[in-house]
A protein has these predicted regions:
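N-terminal small/polar loop signature for handling phosphorylated ligands or for N-terminal nucleophile
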Residues: 64-177, 182-183, 333, 374, ...
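Flexible, glycine/threonine-enriched loop-and-boundary segments that flank and lead into catalytic domains
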Residues: 344-371
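Divalent metal-coordination and catalytic microenvironments
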Residues: 35, 88-90, 142, 168, ...
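Short glycine-cluster motifs
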Residues: 382-398
Length: 578
């Protein structure tokens, strides 16, 4: 049985504004209501929303230190200095490295890239990486998706004659590293108009700035946008403002002319080129790229994403895909073990937080397992495993509205290191400190969390009758894409529906529901629906009982044919039971 969810209707948009916009655009009032909810209130704003334009990208030189960064890169290119592009091992880091490396190798042969080993060096800039750069004669390191807290590492590099340019999007501390340039839209003294770029996005702004300064046509940057949209989707940054523009054109590039490495991933994922969405990246492409860093080496992901030869791309992609299959098997096993630990009470905490530890678990999947436990129990969750002798490392995931990073930071005196965001973080501490850490963080969470945060919420955008789901409605709804944080796929509520008798359990273990739904008030208008992990509702539906259903609308493509399907978020029984 799933955790019970609360349905919450979004506040109604201004009725007169909705009516006027509906009239001006000639669209269903439900669609104009969705637009107004998103801050799109006029015809001109709707035009900009539906027709993203690359000319609306922000001037990259508005970012603090951009002049310094461009000047130092130019100096290295002209002087023939060796440049090392350095990034994290996750999707954002490897796409960022691939983007900047792909651009710079057009300008110089004195270039290489470096991805730290997850289990040997850990996250971010490492002393080992700097030593490798020094031993191989590099004079400039460009960090991507990391480095904003690498104060000591920057000084260590400087002592060895190496300059650093930091491109990051994480929150900085009070004192910035003394690098040649620190590009981070979250700097307090940075007045860049949009601060939710991905790490790859910051790298793109550096490339864009260099191109502007030295008259490189912007059109030559378009092929890099397939990397950028993979980053935007996988790192869950908001798909608003500049990110909406970049994601729109990135998806176009990914669908029409993807690089060899991404084409290999698309094919290995069983996806159909030409119809890829943000969801396809989040659930299919991104996890495969991530598997390289989780199971083997993030360097393999960059080799894939920068491959110029299709045979090489397929070879590397096939190996990464095998790592992903291995990752999924390990993920399933550890998730089951963790669930059993919590249910049996054999865990470190199961009060207001879920904390589990097993020294044998694979470090590369503990973040995924933490997310699974949040789905199961809906509590702030930390999954620990052993990392080195005497040390444990953990991945933390939170519930909506609760700042788990703040909770972890309150225990910083017990930690060797930590980092992350509001809802996701990583941490390392001495094994001997684990009991007191669990006690303190459980106490912090108990004092800080409120009841509203302890029950998942389905935010419903609008009520909808099945009869309103016409080809025109779907055509316009599709133009709301790309979806993501800040522009989520609309969730609709349709009341008093039932299955036409064709409903069945599907999936390897029969855990999902495949339905053909009919609304009682429109009995001749049925529509296909899928409810993932909702098999527990099967008996109720099979008996012919009516339900209310919340869902988003998706298009599935198979051999060039599009099929509309409801992706069910939740179902509620109605009072009038059979």
């Amino acid at each position: 049985m799933a955790v019970e969810k609360i349905w919450k209707m979004r506040e109604g948009a201004d009725v007169e504004n909705v009516r006027q916009l509906s009239s001006e655009l000639g669209v269903d009032p439900v669609l104009s209501e969705l637009l107004v909810q998103r801050g799109v209130r006029t015809f001109e704003q709707a035009r900009s929303f539906f027709r993203p334009n690359l000319n609306d990208l922000h001037d990259p030189f508005l970012m603090q230190d951009m002049d310094k960064a461009v000047e130092r890169v130019r100096q290295a290119v002209v002087a023939g200095e060796k440049i090392l592009v350095y990034g994290d091992y996750d999707v954002d880091g490897t796409t960022a490295v691939s983007l900047v490396y792909s651009f710079l190798r057009r300008l110089t042969r004195q270039i290489d890239f470096y991805i730290p080993e997850r289990y040997d060096e850990g996250y971010g800039v490492s002393y080992k990486g700097i030593d490798w750069a020094s031993a191989n004669g590099f004079r400039l390191i460009i960090t991507l998706d990391c480095g904003i807290k690498a104060n000591e590492k920057v000084e260590y590099a400087r002592e060895r004659g190496i300059d650093m340019i930091i491109c990051d999007h994480h929150l900085p501390e009070n004192e910035l590293p003394k690098a040649v340039a620190v590009l981070d839209p979250k700097r307090e003294d940075c007045h860049y108009p949009f601060d939710d770029l991905s790490g790859c996005g910051v790298g793109f702004k550096l490339v864009q700035a260099y191109s502007l300064r030295y008259d490189i046509p912007f059109d030559s940057l378009i092929p890099l946008l397939d990397l950028l949209v993979v980053s935007i989707a996988s790192d869950l940054v908001s798909v608003t403002d500049e990110n909406r523009i970049l994601a729109h054109f990135g998806l176009k590039q990914l669908n029409v002319n993807p690089r060899e490495g991404l084409l290999a991933m698309i094919q290995l994922s069983g996806l159909e080129p030409g119809h890829l969405t943000i969801d396809d990246i989040v659930f299919k492409i991104g996890p495969r790229i991530n598997a390289a860093g989780r199971m083997e080496s993030g360097r393999m992901a960059v080799e894939l994403l920068t491959a110029l030869d299709s045979e090489e791309a397929v070879r590397i992609g096939t190996e990464i895909n095998e790592h992903n299959n291995e990752r999924k098997n390990i993920d399933r096993r550890i998730t089951q073990e963790a669930l059993e630990m919590v249910r049996s009470g054999n865990c470190l905490s199961s009060g207001n937080a879920t904390i589990v530890y097993n020294p044998q678990w694979h470090k590369g999947v503990v973040g995924i397992v933490a997310s699974r436990l949040v789905e199961a129990f809906y509590k702030p969750t930390i999954v620990f495993t052993k990392s080195q002798e005497g040390l444990v490392t953990g991945s933390a995931r939170s519930v909506h509205g609760f700042d788990l990073y703040d909770a972890i930071e309150s225990c910083s005196d017990l930690l060797e290191n930590f980092g992350g965001h509001l809802y996701a973080a990583g941490l390392t501490l001495k094994e001997e400190n684990l009991p007191v850490f669990c006690e303190r963080i459980e106490k912090f969470i108990s004092n800080a969390i409120i009841p509203e945060m302890q029950t998942p919420v389905v935010d419903v955008d609008a009520r909808l009758n099945f009869s309103q789901i016409t080809p025109k409605f779907l055509r316009i709804l599709k133009q709301f894409q790309p979806f993501g944080p800040g522009n989520s796929a609309p969730v609709f509520l349709t009341e008093n529906v039932y299955d036409n008798g064709m409903g069945r359990k599907v999936g390897a273990e029969g855990g999902h529901l495949k339905l053909e739904l009919i609304q009682e008030s429109h009995p001749y208008h049925h529509i296909s629906a899928i409810g993932f992990n909702m098999a527990y509702f099967f008996d109720h539906i099979k008996a012919g009982n009516p339900i209310d259903v919340c869902y988003s609308i998706v298009e599935n493509y198979y051999r060039g044919t599009a099929n509309t399907q409801l992706r069910v978020k939740d179902m509620h029984e109605r009072d009038e039971m059979i």
